[in-house]
Amino acid sequence: YNQALMDLGATICTPQAPDCPVCPLTTTCQARDLGLQTQRPVLMPRPALPHITVTAAIIQRDSQVLITQRPPHGLLGGLWEFPGGKLQEGETLPDCLQREIREELDVTVEVGSQAGVYRHAYTHFRLTLHAFFCRLLSGEPRPLQVAALRWVQPAELGTYPMGKVDRQIALSLLKT
């Protein structure tokens, strides 16, 4: 019965052009009785997706770059990424990146030029990532809020599983 109703809606009673004269439900259709058949179904507006701004650091040492592994649980769990995090209210992008790197890796970085801006839409939110080239000022990276960290050659980045945005950053490094 359900499949038959769905077929009816897909072929005869379409939202933009219902074909009432050939519909087998004409005698029981309330929308037709009220003259509202072209106004059905009523589409509800979708709520706006939240937008999240994040930063990422491309920390270079010699010919290598630093990548970190996300904790195993949660969004993109276990994938590798360039370290960074969410922008907080009232924070500048460089301040955000310095704070996140300090919290995640216990090091201080100097934020340099912007490497790129990357956008991605997830199911429940939209993301804009600002990537910056950074230089270590003090400390040796330790995995405080990440599962692991590695210094890798840019050519090796393709061997690490990454989310789409981080993969775009990795590909851009191979082009430079």
List the model feature ranges, each with a label.
Residues Y1-P21, L25-L34, D106-T108:
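Catalytic cores of DNA base-excision repair glycosylases
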Residues V22, I58, I67, L129-F133, ...:
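Conserved hydrophobic/aromatic beta-strand scaffold that supports enzyme active sites
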Residues T26, L36-E81, E110:
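N-terminal strand-loop-strand
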Residues R46-P50, H73, Y118-L129:
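Acidic pyrophosphate-coordinating catalytic loop
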Residues E81, R126, R150-W151:
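Short aromatic/basic micro-patch
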Residues F82-G116:
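The catalytic Nudix box helix
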Residues F133-K175:
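NUDIX/MutT-family hydrolases
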